[in-house]
Structure formats: structure tokens, C-alpha cells
């Protein structure tokens, strides 16, 4: 089974498998099993063990690079179950090959297309369409939405099954889910045939007396008031403030790796922050690892509507190729995603990941009418790393947002088309749904996401504290801080009455001023535990959704809270996160390497305003530094003078606005930095992660004297074909004054820099906050020592 060794093509061990690496793995597997008729379900990176990666990443010489491995799931014709393997690309050998019988793999787009074809050509399905009122001439406009069947006790988990939600599109103009049909075929995808059709006791024929076309373009044209919006332009004439090398991105003081796989989509790894020249580890790995969408109606087929979109379909597989219609403005950097289809062919999703910057409003502001020299303000920008994926009728837009004050936000926007049902006129929905159109209803449902966080705050040994706001006996406000020691004690839920948050902290590192452990606070108020009853089909695999917070000891193979295989999993035994906790309920999670599992989401009670297409609705969570930095980490930002804005009448028409259809170009940003940490001291990995030493390998700049006038130049990256950014600034400097206000929100900050008065000093235009802080009477700067100190004046 050995194959000639393959020299892997990658920049970092966490990079996704390249096009050539995927092709190499497919060929190696086929040559190793030439007599087998196999199809591919998954070929993806098998991430290196954390211990191996951290040792290599933070060692002084970067020695001991982990082997490059692929994780493979294949199916063999007429053989139940799946074959799971590990392929070592470094050695050219298959290290693991196991057959799992009672297991159903992830459902790929190829399989969904096959199911649709099977259903539309089945004679019994065609008969049911006619019974529902579909005319003979309209049979070609019948479509199905293939879903995994969940778990159906009639069939167990030994067969690969799907259920087909049926729809009729009258004419050529409506969308594919215009009119729902009232029956549900069951398909055996291995036998490629319909094995049953579930039919309700009370039939619900399609409406014949209303225009149910539901064509979005047509409805748009029929709106009485068509508003032509004047275009809003986002431009970055001097380029972007981020740098990319391989899949590492450096922006402001953040540096992190962007991964991508078939199941989770975007994976953020090795997230560090540069504070005054020290590279401080924040998080080893952050990703969305599951999403449950349970529906609330009872009766015919509705009890099976409980999707696990990551575990059953894979949001990487379902990712849209992004374009300039996705809502991103400005200069955009894209990353593609390569996958293997069931035939072993390599397919590419172009522009699967978008990276761009957005204006973020006020960063901070202070006004003092008694001393206007003390007035300061700064405007913020944010970095957005995003993907968009389609899960059946829903569209999910996932945004990972990095802010200049050290905050990391996850925002998810939900839009798309409602999952609808056929109903009879005046039918009582018993509170389980809403009629959104004549004879069409939509069920109540939930969207529950599981965020997996593996922290690395100044080291590998972290803890989690529950923080509540309470009144003490004197009626004053105090915080209650509880640090659980076991996985059972750590289970908790959001409490709005106490404003509950969770501190992910390092008890071994205390803040020099507050004396509290350095931490990042998890703020999440879009929370709701799963409302399905325990033991029902809708609660299968949903152990992760029963509470908002779980904490477990770190294990390399514990990634997915619904287990490795979610499709058609029964509720007989605990799986995934539920199993890990039940196996060792007293496992210690204090001051050790931990994983935080957070369930958040929303409850959706549909309304007519959601039909025929839903306005986007957002949910948010934040990871915010608390007692982590010595001071506001965004103080290295130039003060803001917005020279590009203008006052105008709301009725003013600007003739110079260009056509909104003008094509914008994305730019690949230049990159010339090495993301590795250079540490000359021969310390243990744990010591290095407590507080990574100041990077001695980067070029140093002299400490600027307090009396010396700062004459730094903006180091904004210039795009090809643009004039040098420094020259541009010099030409405009006289117009903008000493504050250098032009394009202040495009001011570029490299992670490299020098210590200036205790703040991390970046080159930039005038008006730096360090200079402005000299006007505040109770603060001085000890430039000789390069430290920031507080002094009380006599």
C-alpha cells in the first residue's frame, strides 16, 4: 500500500490540502484498492496533533514539522457503511483503514442531485402529484428538496435514506418552492429508488384560486413604490490595512491563520495579538462545529424535520462562490476552496472566503468643555472574514469580525426562503406555525449553533469563570465570580437577570493593575436551549443544544458535538459532547488545556413579512478582552478628522455618482512577513505560551524622544498601479493639516513596531494619541525606560 513519497505543497501544517495534494490522495487510495468500486465522500486535512504543532510553531528553530496527513471517507459499492482512512502524504502510506458498518456519511451535493432525479421520475410520485392537483403539463415543474431522514425507527441506521420535501412551481417564473405538496417520498440512495411515500390522512390539494407564483422579480415589479437608491461608495484608494502570506493574515495587532474544511467551513487558528512588541497567544482554534434546526410542528413527517447542517451536509461543501453581489464593498481579498467529489474529481469553489475591511464607527471619544486640548476621538475600522452557505431553503452569512480594541465577534445573518407546508383553508395550525400566504404555512423552528473555542490565553492552562452581576447586602452592585472545577459543574446557561457572561481566563497570569486573571470575556445574549422534548426524534444528537455552556478537557479527536457521523444517528446512546461528558462527569477543567462549547441562536416564529423571501436577521456573540491588556489596546490609533465626508441636503443629487453596475476589482494583497515567532531563549513550549518573548527577529526602530517632533509616514499598502502611499500623503498633508485626517480609517498598522512611551508605536501621520495624551495632567511618559507610568502631581 506504499506509494512514492509526495512532497507536500503548503505553507503551514494547518493549511487545507491543495489541489495537487487532493489528487495525490485520491490516486493513492485507488491504487491501494484497485479491485474495489469506491466513491469518495470526504478527503480533507487531518490536522496535526496540537502538541506537535505547538512544539513546532513556538520552537526557536521551527524543528519537528508535523507530517502532512489526509482524512478520507469512502464508500464501496454494495457494501454497507463506510471506510475511514488516514493517508500520510509525507511518507506516502495509508496509516489507517477501518470499516464502520452502521454508519451513514455526510450527504454531498452530488447525492442530493441524484435523489432529485430519482424522485421526479418515480411513477408513484407522479401519481401523488396528480392527486394533489398538479396538471399533466406541470409535472416537469415538480421539484424536491432532499433532506436526511434523521432517524426513522421503521428503517434504523443500516440504510442510507433521504426524505424528499415536495414542491410545485407553476409556470416558468416562480421559485422552486412556490407551492408545497402534502406528501413525502422516502428514498434509498444506495438502491436508487423510492421505497415508501408518507401520505397524510387529510389531503391538502394545491391552491387553484390564488396566484401562488411567488416570483420574486415579478413581485418586485408590482410593488407600488420602487425606490431607486443612490449608490453608496466604499473606496480604499491607498489599499488595505492587512497583509496575507499563505493563509496567515496580519491586521492591526492581530495575526491568525485561516483554515477551511468540508464540515466547519472557516476555521480560525493560532490567533495572537501584539501588545507592545510581545506576541501574546489568544486562541488555538475557533470554529462553528454544528448547527441544529429543529421544527416545532407535530404529525405527518414534521417530526423528522431536524437538520444538522454541519454534521449532515457540511457547510464547506455548501459554500457559495462569492462575488461583488454578496454585499462586500471596497478592496476584497478572496480565497478558494478545493474539494473532492464522489467520482474522485477535484472541484473548486471560487472565492469561498472573503476578506475585507469596513468602517466601524467611533472607536473612542472624550470631550471636556473645560480643557479642549484634552478632547480626543478616533474612528474605527474592522476586518471581516466571511463565507456564505446555502442549507436547503436557508442562506447563512457567517462573519468573523476583528476589531481594533482586541474584540473578536461572530455574526451570523439568516435569510432565504421559508420551509413551507400545504394547508387547507381555515386549517387550525394549533400554534405550531403561521399562515404566510393563502393555503401555505410555515412552521415554528429554531436555529442553534455550536461554537467551539480552544483558548490559549498566555499559555495552554486556562479556566472558565461564570460572572454574574448581583446586589450585595448594602444594595450596591458587585460581581459574583465562580470557577467550576469539573465538566459537570461547568454546565451553565445565560441569565439575563444577572447579565451573565463567561470569562475564559489564565489563573497563572494576573493583571499588573487589577490583580485579576488575564481573560477574554464571552458575551452572548442570543441564546435559547433546544425546546424539543428529550427522548424525541427531534432531540437526537442535540445534547450540545440543551445548555449554553459546556467545558471539557482538550482532546485532539473531540471536534464535533454531534459525533463524527450525524446522519441517521439514533438516540439509543449518547454521542459526541453528551458522551464525552457522561463518560467522565468529574473530569477536571480548571487550570488545564480546555475546550469551551457555546450554544447560541434564535427562535423563529414565521410571519407574512418573511414571505416569499426573508429579510436578513442577525445574531451576534463577542470575545472581549478583560484584564488582558495594560490599557486600551486601540490607543495606537491616529485621531480622526474625516476629510472625505461632506454636509448636504437630503434632496441633493450628486451628478458625479457612477453607475451602480460598475464592476469593482478584488485585489490580492502583498505579503512579506514571516508569521513564526522567533524566540532565542531555549524554554519549554508552556513557558513560551505564557507570554511569548518580544520578537527579537524584527527590525528595531529608535525610541523617540518626548521633545522630538514625530514625523512618521503612513505605511498604507499601495496596490499595483497606484502611487506610493507616502508620496500621496505628503502631497495632501498641507490640505489635511497636522492631524493627517485623510483616509484616517485606512491607516495601516503592522504588527512590527517599536515601543513609544509604553504604547506600541506604529509609523503614521501626525496627531498620534501618545502626543495628545501629554495634555492630560495626571499622566506622564517615562521614555527612557520605554514604560507607561502613572504619576500623581503635587
Swiss-Prot record:
Which UniProt keywords are present, listed alphabetically?
Copper, Cytoplasm, Manganese, Metal-binding, Oxidoreductase, TPQ
> Which SUPFAM superfamilies does UniProt cross-reference here?
Amine oxidase catalytic domain, Amine oxidase N-terminal region
**Record field: compositional bias (Polar residues):** 716-727
GO terms in the biological process aspect are: amine metabolic process; cellular detoxification
Q: In the UniProt entry, which residues are flagged as the active site? A: 309, 394
**Residue sites binding substrate per the record:** 307-318, 391-396
Write out the ranges of the annotated region (Disordered): 563-584, 634-748
Q: Which cofactor does it need?
A: Cu cation; Zn(2+); L-topaquinone; Mn(2+)
Q: MF terms per GO, please?
A: copper ion binding; oxidoreductase activity, acting on the CH-NH2 group of donors, oxygen as acceptor; quinone binding
Name the InterPro entries on file. Cu_Am_Ox_Cu-bd, Cu_Am_ox_TPQ-bd, Cu_amine_oxidase, Cu_amine_oxidase_C, Cu_amine_oxidase_C_sf, Cu_amine_oxidase_N-reg, Cu_amine_oxidase_N2, Cu_amine_oxidase_N3
Q: Name one GO cellular component term.
A: cytosol
Question: For the modification 2',4',5'-topaquinone, which residues carry it?
Answer: 394
The residues that the entry says bind Mn(2+) are 593-594
Swiss-Prot/TrEMBL catalytic activity: a primary methyl amine + O2 + H2O = an aldehyde + H2O2 + NH4(+)
Q: Where does Cu cation bind?
A: 445, 447, 604
Q: Kindly provide the PTM information from the record.
A: Topaquinone (TPQ) is generated by copper-dependent autoxidation of a specific tyrosyl residue.
The family line of this record is: Belongs to the copper/topaquinone oxidase family.
Summarizing the function annotation, the protein's role is:
Copper amine oxidase-like protein that does not show any copper amine oxidase activity. May be the appropriate amine substrate for cao2 has not been identified yet.
What name goes with this protein?
Copper amine oxidase-like protein cao2
- Recorded source organism is Schizosaccharomyces pombe (strain 972 / ATCC 24843)
Name of the gene: cao2
